[in-house]
Amino acid sequence: AFYKNEVEQRHWYGLWDYGDIMHTYDAQRHCWRYDMGGYAWQNTELIPTLWLLLAFMRSGREDIFTMAEAMSRHSADVDIYHFGDLKGLGSRHNVVHWGDSCKEPRIAMAGHHRALYYLMGGDPRIGDAMDDVKDADYATLNMDPLRYFYKKEEMKLPTHARSGPDWSTYCSNWYTAW
Protein backbone atom coordinates (compact mmCIF):
# COMPACT_ATOMS: atom_id res chain seq x y z
CA ALA A 1 0.00 0.00 0.00
CA PHE A 2 2.86 2.41 0.78
CA TYR A 3 4.45 2.06 -2.66
CA LYS A 4 1.11 2.27 -4.45
CA ASN A 5 0.24 5.43 -2.51
CA GLU A 6 3.61 6.96 -3.41
CA VAL A 7 2.99 6.21 -7.10
CA GLU A 8 -0.38 7.99 -6.87
CA GLN A 9 0.89 10.94 -4.82
CA ARG A 10 4.05 11.53 -6.89
CA HIS A 11 2.48 10.75 -10.28
CA TRP A 12 5.06 8.12 -11.21
CA TYR A 13 3.29 7.15 -14.40
CA GLY A 14 4.23 6.73 -18.03
CA LEU A 15 6.42 4.31 -19.93
CA TRP A 16 9.63 5.06 -18.02
CA ASP A 17 8.41 5.53 -14.44
CA TYR A 18 5.36 3.35 -13.81
CA GLY A 19 6.31 0.23 -11.88
CA ASP A 20 9.38 1.73 -10.25
CA ILE A 21 9.84 3.58 -6.99
CA MET A 22 12.48 5.82 -5.50
CA HIS A 23 15.29 4.14 -3.58
CA THR A 24 16.13 6.55 -0.74
CA TYR A 25 14.23 9.22 1.17
CA ASP A 26 16.04 12.45 2.09
CA ALA A 27 15.10 13.31 5.68
CA GLN A 28 16.66 16.80 5.47
CA ARG A 29 14.70 17.89 2.39
CA HIS A 30 11.62 15.74 3.16
CA CYS A 31 11.50 14.28 -0.31
CA TRP A 32 12.87 11.35 -2.27
CA ARG A 33 16.45 11.67 -3.50
CA TYR A 34 15.24 11.86 -7.08
CA ASP A 35 18.16 14.02 -8.16
CA MET A 36 21.12 12.04 -6.77
CA GLY A 37 22.65 9.17 -8.72
CA GLY A 38 22.91 6.02 -6.65
CA TYR A 39 19.82 6.99 -4.64
CA ALA A 40 17.11 7.77 -7.17
CA TRP A 41 15.08 5.06 -8.98
CA GLN A 42 15.14 1.69 -7.27
CA ASN A 43 15.41 -0.43 -10.45
CA THR A 44 14.64 -3.62 -8.51
CA GLU A 45 17.32 -3.07 -5.87
CA LEU A 46 16.35 -4.99 -2.71
CA ILE A 47 14.10 -7.21 -4.87
CA PRO A 48 10.66 -5.69 -4.19
CA THR A 49 9.19 -7.76 -7.03
CA LEU A 50 9.87 -10.97 -5.14
CA TRP A 51 8.71 -9.92 -1.70
CA LEU A 52 5.60 -8.23 -3.08
CA LEU A 53 4.64 -11.41 -4.97
CA LEU A 54 5.23 -13.47 -1.84
CA ALA A 55 3.11 -10.99 0.16
CA PHE A 56 0.36 -11.33 -2.44
CA MET A 57 0.44 -15.13 -2.22
CA ARG A 58 0.10 -14.90 1.56
CA SER A 59 -2.65 -12.26 1.59
CA GLY A 60 -4.46 -12.46 -1.75
CA ARG A 61 -4.57 -8.64 -1.85
CA GLU A 62 -5.11 -7.27 -5.34
CA ASP A 63 -3.28 -3.98 -4.63
CA ILE A 64 -0.11 -5.87 -3.75
CA PHE A 65 -0.34 -7.99 -6.91
CA THR A 66 -0.86 -5.00 -9.22
CA MET A 67 2.21 -3.27 -7.76
CA ALA A 68 4.31 -6.45 -8.14
CA GLU A 69 3.01 -6.87 -11.69
CA ALA A 70 3.88 -3.27 -12.59
CA MET A 71 7.37 -3.68 -11.10
CA SER A 72 7.95 -6.97 -12.93
CA ARG A 73 6.94 -5.46 -16.25
CA HIS A 74 8.90 -2.26 -15.63
CA SER A 75 12.08 -4.14 -14.78
CA ALA A 76 11.65 -6.37 -17.83
CA ASP A 77 11.04 -3.50 -20.25
CA VAL A 78 12.93 -0.49 -18.88
CA ASP A 79 15.74 -1.58 -16.55
CA ILE A 80 17.27 -4.28 -18.80
CA TYR A 81 19.37 -3.92 -21.94
CA HIS A 82 17.79 -6.22 -24.53
CA PHE A 83 20.37 -5.94 -27.33
CA GLY A 84 23.83 -4.64 -28.10
CA ASP A 85 27.05 -4.93 -26.11
CA LEU A 86 25.22 -4.56 -22.78
CA LYS A 87 22.51 -7.16 -23.46
CA GLY A 88 21.60 -8.89 -20.21
CA LEU A 89 22.81 -6.11 -17.92
CA GLY A 90 20.70 -3.58 -16.07
CA SER A 91 21.16 -0.06 -14.74
CA ARG A 92 21.42 0.45 -10.99
CA HIS A 93 19.36 3.12 -9.24
CA ASN A 94 19.97 6.26 -11.28
CA VAL A 95 18.42 9.69 -11.73
CA VAL A 96 17.07 8.44 -15.06
CA HIS A 97 16.44 4.71 -15.39
CA TRP A 98 19.35 4.01 -17.75
CA GLY A 99 21.46 6.81 -16.25
CA ASP A 100 25.07 6.43 -15.28
CA SER A 101 27.73 3.84 -15.98
CA CYS A 102 26.64 1.39 -13.25
CA LYS A 103 25.60 -1.49 -15.48
CA GLU A 104 25.35 -4.76 -13.57
CA PRO A 105 23.87 -8.21 -14.17
CA ARG A 106 22.07 -8.30 -10.78
CA ILE A 107 19.53 -5.68 -11.87
CA ALA A 108 18.41 -8.01 -14.67
CA MET A 109 18.45 -11.26 -12.62
CA ALA A 110 15.75 -13.58 -13.96
CA GLY A 111 15.25 -15.78 -10.92
CA HIS A 112 14.15 -13.36 -8.26
CA HIS A 113 12.70 -10.57 -10.36
CA ARG A 114 10.44 -12.20 -12.88
CA ALA A 115 10.30 -15.99 -12.65
CA LEU A 116 7.58 -16.08 -9.99
CA TYR A 117 5.45 -13.53 -11.85
CA TYR A 118 5.91 -15.47 -15.09
CA LEU A 119 4.87 -18.72 -13.41
CA MET A 120 1.81 -17.04 -11.89
CA GLY A 121 0.59 -15.33 -15.05
CA GLY A 122 2.39 -16.75 -18.05
CA ASP A 123 3.08 -13.32 -19.59
CA PRO A 124 5.12 -14.19 -22.73
CA ARG A 125 6.90 -10.80 -22.68
CA ILE A 126 8.37 -11.69 -19.28
CA GLY A 127 9.53 -15.01 -20.75
CA ASP A 128 11.30 -13.11 -23.53
CA ALA A 129 13.03 -10.85 -21.00
CA MET A 130 14.20 -13.85 -18.97
CA ASP A 131 15.61 -15.34 -22.17
CA ASP A 132 17.40 -12.05 -22.95
CA VAL A 133 19.44 -12.22 -19.74
CA LYS A 134 20.53 -15.87 -19.76
CA ASP A 135 23.93 -14.99 -21.24
CA ALA A 136 24.54 -11.81 -19.24
CA ASP A 137 27.97 -13.15 -18.28
CA TYR A 138 29.20 -12.35 -21.80
CA ALA A 139 28.14 -8.71 -21.46
CA THR A 140 30.61 -8.18 -18.62
CA LEU A 141 33.39 -8.73 -21.15
CA ASN A 142 32.25 -5.41 -22.65
CA MET A 143 31.71 -3.63 -19.33
CA ASP A 144 33.54 -4.94 -16.26
CA PRO A 145 31.43 -4.24 -13.14
CA LEU A 146 34.64 -3.42 -11.23
CA ARG A 147 36.32 -1.33 -13.93
CA TYR A 148 36.63 1.67 -11.60
CA PHE A 149 38.43 -0.32 -8.90
CA TYR A 150 41.12 -2.01 -11.00
CA LYS A 151 43.47 -0.62 -13.61
CA LYS A 152 42.91 -2.34 -16.95
CA GLU A 153 46.64 -2.83 -17.55
CA GLU A 154 47.05 -4.65 -14.21
CA MET A 155 44.20 -7.11 -14.78
CA LYS A 156 45.07 -10.73 -15.52
CA LEU A 157 41.61 -11.54 -16.90
CA PRO A 158 39.31 -9.43 -19.11
CA THR A 159 36.61 -8.95 -16.43
CA HIS A 160 35.56 -9.69 -12.86
CA ALA A 161 32.69 -11.67 -11.39
CA ARG A 162 31.90 -11.02 -7.74
CA SER A 163 30.75 -14.11 -5.85
CA GLY A 164 27.60 -12.46 -4.50
CA PRO A 165 25.94 -10.15 -6.98
CA ASP A 166 27.45 -11.50 -10.21
CA TRP A 167 27.76 -15.27 -9.80
CA SER A 168 24.40 -15.55 -8.05
CA THR A 169 22.85 -13.68 -10.98
CA TYR A 170 24.52 -15.87 -13.60
CA CYS A 171 23.41 -19.04 -11.82
CA SER A 172 19.90 -17.68 -11.39
CA ASN A 173 19.68 -16.78 -15.08
CA TRP A 174 20.99 -20.17 -16.21
CA TYR A 175 18.74 -22.07 -13.81
CA THR A 176 15.67 -20.05 -14.82
CA ALA A 177 16.41 -20.60 -18.52
CA TRP A 178 16.87 -24.31 -17.91
Language-model segments: residues:
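Catalytic cores of extracellular degradative/oxidative enzymes
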Residues: 1-178
